[in-house]
Structures are given as C-alpha cells and as structure tokens.
Amino acid sequence: MATIVRQNGLTPIQETNEVKSFLKERGIDYDHWKVPHNASNLTDKEVLVDTEKEELLKKLDDRFETLKAKEGYQSRDLIVLHPNVSGLNEMLAKFDKVHYHTDEEVRYIVDGSGVFGFAFKDEKFLVHVYKDDFISVPRNTNHWFYLDDKKRIKAVRYFQDMSGWVPNYVEETNSLD
C-alpha cells in the first residue's frame, strides 16, 4: 500500500482510503490492484528476458483491456529495474528531475517499490508506491520519480500516445523543503 510523505514533518498517510482521498483531491488516480498469484513465478525473478516480460504482461492483460475500453489506452510495456541493469543511474537521472508530460503517466507496480514526488503550486509531497499499487499522474502535472534504497521495481507502463510521454523539464527543486 502506498504511503504519502508530506512537507514540514506532517504525519505520513498510510491508510488506503486516506491515500486515495488525498490523491484524488489533487487529481491523481490511485488504486490497489492485487497482482494475480499465477504471476508470482515471474514477479519474484530479478531479471526477466523479453519472452518472460511478454508472458507477465499477458497475465496482467485484464487491467490493460479495462484501461483500453474505459480510457483509450493503446499500448503497454513492462519496465524491470534492479541494481544490475546496465546504465541504471543514468536512466534514473532522467526521471528524478521535476518534469511533466502532455499525456498521463500511468503505472501498475507489480513488484518492488519506488517514489513519485509531486510539486503543486503550494504543496509538495512524495508517494511511496509498492507492489499492487496503481497510480495515474495527470497530464501537465509536475512530478519526479526515483527508486528507493532497494533499487528494484517492475512496473507496467500504459500509454495512450507515446508522443505525449516525452518529459518536459521545469525549473523546480524535487526537495520537500
């Protein structure tokens, strides 16, 4: 379950309904989608070859079909990050700067964990996401992402249009201070 860390030492938010409510008030869609048990043979592996990635995506396709029907999503892929990924730090450096996309950024965390940061006009906060978390960052929302200390995540990325997923960087710090 996601945890929200706020500025100025405010108490973290951990209860699912409170997390959903907090994020919904800010236009961020959040849900808790259990990864099917028949996928654990793949989610438990650190490294997946392309055929295993496709097999895992197929086991999760009910979610994709729902997003296609309801919101017009056209494609999806699986990103698998772990400490042994070549160029991991360089890759992560693209995401840890404050940016926005002209399309939604939609993620379904199927293993591991990471942190989304959000910068609104008068508020910054972090959302620590874990396995089974679904989050949709609205288009044109300033945010950033980094891996936590475990440096391990498997996430399905859903796209309506790949051209809208290009990051547009802004002059904003990713610090909660």
UniProtKB/Swiss-Prot annotation:
Binds 1 Fe(2+) cation per monomer. It catalyses: 1,2-dihydroxy-5-(methylsulfanyl)pent-1-en-3-one + O2 = 3-(methylsulfanyl)propanoate + CO + formate + 2 H(+); 1,2-dihydroxy-5-(methylsulfanyl)pent-1-en-3-one + O2 = 4-methylsulfanyl-2-oxobutanoate + formate + 2 H(+). The record marks R107 as: Important to generate the dianion. GO terms for molecular function: acireductone dioxygenase (Ni2+-requiring) activity; acireductone dioxygenase [iron(II)-requiring] activity; iron ion binding; nickel cation binding. It holds the Pfam family ARD. Catalyzes 2 different reactions between oxygen and the acireductone 1,2-dihydroxy-3-keto-5-methylthiopentene (DHK-MTPene) depending upon the metal bound in the active site. Fe-containing acireductone dioxygenase (Fe-ARD) produces formate and 2-keto-4-methylthiobutyrate (KMTB), the alpha-ketoacid precursor of methionine in the methionine recycle pathway. Ni-containing acireductone dioxygenase (Ni-ARD) produces methylthiopropionate, carbon monoxide and formate, and does not lie on the methionine recycle pathway. Belongs to the acireductone dioxygenase (ARD) family. PANTHER family: ACIREDUCTONE DIOXYGENASE. This is Acireductone dioxygenase. It comes from Leptospira interrogans serogroup Icterohaemorrhagiae serovar Lai (strain 56601). The gene is mtnD.
